[in-house]
């Protein structure tokens, strides 16, 4: 990240993986907040892969640092439906979802949970039906 200057526009990272994105995330939440603050940024999103394990810790750390927390998730979207589990056909596509409000947060929790309970195929997967059902309050 570059240091802010007087001529820079406000900037917020909207695609960050924390230590809760297993095998992918290298950011420790507390250290991340320190760096975001050092760079003069006022907001940041947490979009771990398929999980929301770190959202509460992320939210509390951001608030404590005076940074606006944006809760989200990089969900895995099944090619056909979350129930289909055929190798080479039902791969995963990635989609970043961000919560606009409390309704979006609740809907994202429901969607991610359904991905684990109903759509798990090496990774928790959602599908178009879940996106249609739980889209309210999400970007």
PLM region descriptions:
Residues 1-139:
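Phosphodiester-processing cores and adjacent nucleic acid-binding clamps
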């Amino acid at each position: 990240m570059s240091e802010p200057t007087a001529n820079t526009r406000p900037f917020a990272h909207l695609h960050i993986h924390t230590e809760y994105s297993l095998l992918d995330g290298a950011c420790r939440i507390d250290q991340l907040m320190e760096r975001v603050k050092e760079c003069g940024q006022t907001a940041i999103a947490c979009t771990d892969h398929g999980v929301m394990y770190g959202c509460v810790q992320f939210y509390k750390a951001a608030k404590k640092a005076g940074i606006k927390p944006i809760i989200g998730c990089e969900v895995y979207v099944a090619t056909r439906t979350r129930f289909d589990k055929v190798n080479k056909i039902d791969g995963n596509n990635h989609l970043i979802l961000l919560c606009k409000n409390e309704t979006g947060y609740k809907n994202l929790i429901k969607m991610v949970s359904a991905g684990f309970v109903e759509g798990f195929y090496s990774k928790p997967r959602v599908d178009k039906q879940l996106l249609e059902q739980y889209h309210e309050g999400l970007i």
